[in-house]
Regions:
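Charged helix-capping and loop-helix junction motifs
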Residues: 11-17, 43-51, 81-93, 143-151, ...
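Short, histidine-centered active-site or binding-site loop motifs used for metal coordination
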Residues: 31, 70-72, 163-165
Length: 227
């Protein structure tokens, strides 16, 4: 569930959603124009308030996971991005504490970071309380590390799935674009997966079912060869 900032104050809406949402729920916290490290103190304060309120709303919905962005502006160099890491880890202290209190797992998603190495210090600073969410389209379109491999080395426990033409963040169905999910996604099918597509998701669901079937077939072959 994306927590649209334009609707975040609507109490009746969240009460209705809570009754209608079945099973496990994950949310995406607000991110537009937010940055805990903005040079503008007003933006820093607003960012903290929106993240904390978003976590409160997540708990109201019964969500067990909440994804957020680091807020890094697009086009930062690896050196600039790395310089942000420890200050960001410190600025996240109150957010991590609120998530812990509410019982919501906090997940940092790659967005405009140039490379995965700049996220590692943040994740390590809050080890055990902050996980990683991987979005392959963001890596391909926004970063200087388009290959999923280095990002997957961060050990994502949550993945946002969609496809892209490699130029824009299209949110296409899986298999329609250039991300090659069949080449790398199979070992992560046991993690929490969220489809983020802007079209009928049936094609993506069929893709995932077929990929899972290929994995089972390969596993069965290994068992047969081991006998």
């Amino acid at each position: 569930v994306y927590l649209d900032p334009a609707l975040l104050e609507e109490d009746a809406l969240f009460q209705s959603l809570r009754r209608r949402l079945p099973g496990r729920v994950s949310v995406h916290l607000p991110f537009w124009n937010l940055d805990l490290l903005s040079p503008d103190p007003e933006v820093r304060g607003l960012t903290l308030r929106r993240l904390l309120f978003g976590l409160d709303r997540a708990a109201e919905l019964g969500a067990d996971r909440a994804v957020f962005h680091s807020g890094i502006p697009h086009g930062r160099t690896p050196e600039e991005a790395l310089e942000r890491a420890l200050p960001l880890a410190e600025a996240l202290g109150l957010v991590v504490r609120r998530a812990r209190t509410l019982g919501v797992r906090l997940l940092l998603e790659n967005s405009h970071e140039p490379c995965p190495e700049v996220l590692r210090p943040v994740l390590e600073a809050h080890a055990g309380e902050l996980g990683f969410c991987f979005d392959a389209a963001h890596a391909r379109v926004f970063s200087r590390t388009p290959d999923p491999g280095p990002w997957l080395a961060l050990g994502p426990e949550h993945l946002h799935l969609n496809d892209t033409d490699g130029v824009y963040d299209r949110h296409w169905n899986l298999g329609r674009g250039v991300l090659g999910h069949r080449e790398w996604l199979l070992p992560f099918l046991g993690r929490t997966l969220v489809l983020e597509v802007r079209e009928d998701p049936e094609a993506s669901l069929a893709f995932l079912q077929a990929l899972a079937g290929e994995g089972r077939t390969a596993f069965d072959r290994l068992l047969m060869e081991g006998r």
